[in-house]
Amino acid sequence: AILTGVPYYILPSTSRAGFSPDNLRKNTSQLSCPLDLITQLRFPRRIGVPVIFTPQNSSLKVVPLSHNLNIHTCSDLWFCPESKIWTVKSSLTHGGSVVTTGGTFRSLGSWFRIERHGDSYKLVHCPRGSTPCRDVGIETVGGGGRRYLAPRDRPLAVRFTRASG
């Protein structure tokens, strides 16, 4: 079970590589805010940055499947004025929508869900807090092959590992 308010890594079910906000560890003068979420698939030993799940029903101690929740990047290193809450926004840089930070707690546009996907799980984005929701998958952008989380027809199968300490 995934516990509310406890940090977890979101990992692709077939890899140890996780997700982290783009540019989080770069020189702060080069930051472009808000920070889009990238995969660390090219760096399989990097498990990314943990997140905290907060269900819409804040009295729940366990995060339920197929219910609205906010995803909050759990990092002490943060240089952007925007929030650490995940949302989906259009990106001129990437030519489509991407999962990014800067969402608003408990508001439309920042709702995601965890759903079963075979033997794994998947994330879906529910912009209105109800259906239709869209699967979150991988979008490869540019010659450098950066892989961003984005609404896609093909979901990324994921698993969750509790962050230690």
From Swiss-Prot:
Pfam families: Kunitz_legume (PF00197). CDD domains: beta-trefoil_STI_CrataBL-like. This is Bark lectin isoform 2. GO terms for molecular function: carbohydrate binding; serine-type endopeptidase inhibitor activity; toxin activity. The keyword Cytoplasm does not apply. Keywords: Disulfide bond, Glycoprotein, Hemagglutinin, Lectin, Protease inhibitor, Serine protease inhibitor, Toxin. Glucose and N-acetylglucosamine binding lectin. Has hemagglutinating activity against human and rabbit erythrocytes which does not require divalent cations. Inhibits factor Xa and, to a lesser extent, trypsin. Does not inhibit neutrophil elastase, human plasma kallikrein, papain, human plasmin, porcine pancreatic kallikrein and bovin chymotrypsin. Has insecticidal activity against the termite species N.corniger. Induces apoptosis in prostrate cancer cell lines DU145 and PC3. Hemagglutinating activity is stable between 30 and 60 degrees Celsius. Disulfide bonds join C33-C80, C126-C133. InterPro entries: Kunitz_inhibitor_STI-like_sf (IPR011065), Prot_inh_Kunz-lg (IPR002160). It comes from the Eukaryota. The keyword Glycoprotein applies.
